Regions:
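ATP-binding/phosphotransfer module of carbohydrate and carboxylate kinases, centering on a glycine-rich
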Residues: 2, 19-27, 41-51, 88-184
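Phosphate-binding/catalytic loop of phosphoryl-transfer enzymes
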Residues: 2-98
Length: 184
């Protein structure tokens, strides 16, 4: 299992995996969560190269985030910077079920649309986006609500951080209908 706020793998205990891999391979090793590593890659050679203040938000099973301030990936004192999945979405009922990670899962949106549209494979994102792109009455409300939650997350990040650039990542980020609906 993992820690809700840091994503730390509790079963690893105090095992220093980076040192183990470094020693075995003779190569420099950095271990971080997927969103922070993707943000580092974008900062190094991608769409965040040369950007002073930016972020990468990953949409997948949960919602990840990497934050760049003054040209550097931020980690924070408790290594929780960018943990947007832990942000509360319902102030009247602040529980794990009302966090961005629980309410804005791209995987859950895909599953919900698949069930609503009676798509046999509930993980078939291609079939789901065919329904969405067709404007299917069963798919569209679920997809639109998901995009609204992503847009609200982006608005809140921008309001607090005044970023130069925000990137979206994750498997569904290449879908034109996703960006069009968020931009709407």
């Amino acid at each position: 299992s993992s820690d809700l706020f840091t994503g730390a793998l509790s079963f690893m205990g105090n095992f220093d995996l980076a040192s183990y891999i470094r020693q075995a391979s003779g190569c420099p090793v950095f271990i971080g969560n997927d969103a922070n590593c993707a943000t580092l890659a974008e900062l190094w050679q991608g769409r965040l190269k040369g950007v002073e203040n930016g972020a990468l938000i990953t949409l997948g099973t949960s919602v990840g985030g990497g934050l760049v301030l003054n040209g550097h990936l931020m980690s924070g004192r408790h290594f929780q910077t960018g943990q947007v999945s832990a942000m509360v979405t319902n102030f009247d009922e602040p529980t794990p079920a009302t966090t961005v990670g629980a309410t804005t899962s791209a995987v859950k949106m895909i599953e919900d649309v698949a069930v609503a549209c009676k798509i046999k494979d509930t993980h078939d994102g291609w079939a789901v986006f065919e329904k969405i792109d067709e404007g299917d009455d069963r798919a569209w409300p679920i997809f639109s609500a998901f995009c609204r939650r992503v847009a609200l997350l982006l608005i809140n990040l921008q309001a607090v951080l005044d970023l130069d650039r925000v990137l979206l990542g994750g498997g569904i980020s290449s879908q034109p209908s996703l960006l069009a609906e968020i931009d709407y």
